[in-house]
Amino acid sequence: MAKKSMIEREKKRSRLIAKYADKRAELKEQLRQAEDLDDKIEIQRQLQRLPRNSAPSRHRNRCWVTGRPRGYYRDFGLSRNVLREWAHQGLLPGVVKSSW
């Protein structure tokens, strides 16, 4: 189980990403369309003034049960350990053990 502080930090990042998504997209579009170098530099500065944790690249997928950041399955939102355990218990509809 991940530390609660790490899980909360990731939740805070998610909130910041959602809060600043429109502003960030707008600035990036302005940057793309700007032709003057001084304008581009100013827009880039505005982008850099946004909170660091509002960048989507800082988001880390975590298991919603354990908070584990590695071995994450996007389809389920679970780590490999929980996925295996729940699949064996039959808690995941449609998931069956492979056999050939």
UniProtKB/Swiss-Prot annotation:
Record protein name field: Small ribosomal subunit protein uS14
PANTHER family in the cross-refs: 30S RIBOSOMAL PROTEIN S14, SMALL RIBOSOMAL SUBUNIT PROTEIN US14M
InterPro entries: Ribosomal_uS14 (IPR001209), Ribosomal_uS14_bac/plastid (IPR023036), Ribosomal_uS14_CS (IPR018271)
Pfam families (UniProt xref): Ribosomal_S14
Taxonomic source organism: Gloeothece citriformis (strain PCC 7424) (Cyanothece sp. (strain PCC 7424))
UniProt KW Ribosomal protein keyword: yes
UniProt record, GO biological process: translation
UniProt KW RNA-binding keyword: yes
One annotated GO molecular function: rRNA binding
